[in-house]
């Protein structure tokens, strides 16, 4: 089942019905945000972080994690990083044994011919979301949303942030964190922000 990443940003709860979910694409910052939302949303659950290479070397790593129930937590969340088509057979095998576990896969760009991408797009029980590179419009929305209520947030300040981050969501978030730390009174000073942002 295909989900649009911009809709997930607004309504992240919509993925709760999927036992398996694949995030793919070149936008590392967006995938990082989704991972953080999953961690926040599932604080009381055990969260495991695995990589495809370790699972390919020993598929029992994943199979055991799915079959073994935790003594402390009812549910388990598993992140599998840097996946590609090589993991498809293992995922297909594991999904049959899943009960309360949820698995989230993270991949770089997958072309339309990708078997993994096709599997997730056609499945009714799995979800998939493309994380495409941000453009100036999406970056502006992020800045406006996170700095909402700040006096002095002008087009000039927004443009300065965009120029200094090169449309990289991770860098934008870091710069916004700096601004929030520096301007605790929520009054942005253009001279100070220029110095702050050029201090990369």
Predicted regions and their residues:
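Conserved beta/loop motifs at nucleotide-recognition and modification sites
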Residues: 1-200
